Design a protein with these regions (language model features):
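Metal-cofactor-binding active-site regions of metalloenzymes
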Residues: 2-197, 205-211, 219, 224, ...
C-alpha cells in the first residue's frame, strides 16, 4: 500500500459512519454459517459454504446463497439473533455508529414453522445486545421479496403492523427486479404508508429502466431509494430527485456493473462516478459485505480511489446518510454536528 493510500486508510478507520443499505443474510460470517448448518443438520456442506465466499471477476449475485440459508440452514430464531449481533459487532469495529438493515422474512417463514414475531423479536434482541456491548444503534427494515406474490408482500406488512415495534421503522423491497416492477407491491406500500411506516425500495439496480425509479417515487411514494443507477438516463427525473432531496443508497461493489462492464472501464463508466457530480444525494454502503468481500472502510475507499471523489465528498456522503436515515430529527441534528466535528478533527490530524 502506498503512503497516500495508507494515510487515506488510517483516516477512514477513524471517521464515524452510518450504514443504510445492508442485507442481514449478506453479513453472515463463514464460520457462523458452518456452525448453523451443522447445528441444524443442514444438507449444506462446508465446501459449498466455502464457495459462497469466493467472488469471481464477473460475480453472479448472492440470491442463491440467501435461498440456501432460507430453505436449508436457518431453523431457529436464535440463528437470526446471532447473525444480527455479529453483523453489528463487525460494523462497530469499523466505526459504524448506526445501521439500518434489511431482513427478508417471507422466505424463512415459508420454509420453516417459525413465526414472524419470534424471528423479529430474536433480531431485536441481537440489536439490543450489540448496542449494550458495542454502542452501535440500529433499526430493522423488513423487506419484500419481489419474487414472491403481491399478496405475500402485503402479508409481510400486515405482520409488521400486528407486531409493531419502534425499532422496526419501515419497509424495503429487494431481490430480482427484472419482471418484478415496483407497482406489483403497490398495495403493500399503501398499507405501510397508511400505518406510518417509512419506505424505501431497490430500483434501477440491474440495468432496468429509469421508469422503475420513477414508479417507486410516484406509485409507492418512497422516502428514499436504493441503487437507482438508471435515474441518470432521464435528466428530468434527476432534477426531480435533486429538488426533492431524496437520498439514494449506492453500492460500489454492485454485482451487475462488475459483471457487465470491463475491468478496464468499470471505474470510469460506473454510474456512481456521475451521480453525486450530477447533484444527486448519495450515500455508499456495503450491501452484502460477507459475499462482496467488502467492509465499510473499503467501501469508502472505493469512492475515492475508484470513482474519484474527494475527502470533502466523503463528509457530504456521511451527512447525507444521517439526513436520509430514519432516526428522530433531533438525534440526526445532534449527530450531524458531533460527527462533523469528529470528521474535521481526524482530517486535521491525519492529512
Amino acid at each position: 500500500m502506498s503512503e497516500a493510500n495508507s494515510t487515506l486508510n488510517e483516516f477512514l478507520k477513524q471517521i464515524p459512519k452510518i450504514e443504510l443499505h445492508c442485507h442481514l443474510l449478506g453479513t453472515i460470517r463463514k464460520e457462523t454459517m458452518k456452525d448453523l448448518a451443522r447445528k441444524n443438520g443442514s444438507r449444506t456442506t462446508d465446501a459449498e459454504i466455502d464457495a459462497f465466499y469466493v467472488r469471481g471477476e464477473k460475480p453472479v449475485g448472492v440470491l442463491h446463497i440467501f435461498r440456501e440459508l432460507e430453505n436449508h440452514i436457518l431453523q431457529a430464531p436464535d440463528d437470526l439473533r446471532r447473525i444480527a449481533y455479529e453483523y453489528l459487532e463487525d460494523a462497530s469495529r469499523q466505526q459504524v455508529r448506526h445501521a439500518e438493515f434489511f431482513w427478508n422474512p417471507t422466505g424463512t417463514l415459508a420454509a420453516t414453522t417459525l413465526s414472524y414475531s419470534a424471528l423479529q423479536n430474536a433480531i431485536l434482541v441481537g440489536m439490543n445486545e450489540a448496542e449494550t456491548d458495542f454502542g452501535i444503534t440500529s433499526l430493522l427494515i423488513p423487506s419484500i421479496d419481489r419474487e414472491a406474490s403481491a399478496s405475500a408482500g402485503l402479508e409481510m406488512v400486515e405482520l409488521m403492523c400486528t407486531h409493531r415495534h419502534p425499532d422496526v421503522v419501515g419497509i424495503g423491497m429487494d431481490y430480482i427486479e427484472v419482471n418484478n416492477p415496483p407497482e406489483k407491491f403497490s398495495d403493500a406500500y399503501a398499507l405501510a404508508k397508511k400505518s406510518g411506516l417509512k419506505t424505501t425500495a431497490h430500483a434501477g439496480e440491474f440495468g432496468t429502466s429509469w421508469k422503475n425509479v420513477e414508479t417507486a417515487m410516484n406509485v409507492l411514494g418512497v422516502d428514499r431509494l436504493d441503487h437507482a443507477y438508471t435515474v441518470l438516463d432521464n435528466s428530468a427525473l434527476v432534477s426531480r430527485c435533486i429538488d426533492q432531496g431524496i437520498l439514494i443508497t449506492v453500492v460500489p461493489t454492485n454485482s451487475y456493473y462488475l459483471r457487465t462492464l470491463s475491468a478496464d472501464s468499470w471505474a470510469q463508466e460506473h454510474p456512481i462516478r456521475r451521480m453525486a457530480r450530477a447533484g444527486l444525494k448519495i450515500h455508499p454502503n456495503t450491501d452484502d459485505p460477507a459475499f462482496h468481500l467488502v467492509d465499510p472502510i473499503k467501501c469508502q475507499r472505493m469512492m475515492v480511489e475508484a470513482f474519484g471523489y474527494s475527502i470533502d465528498d466523503l463528509k457530504s456522503f456521511m451527512l447525507n446518510g444521517l439526513e436520509g436515515s430514519w432516526l428522530e430529527n433531533t438525534t440526526k441534528s445532534n449527530l450531524s454536528k458531533q460527527w462533523s466535528v469528529e470528521f474535521n478533527e481526524q482530517r486535521q490530524k491525519i492529512f
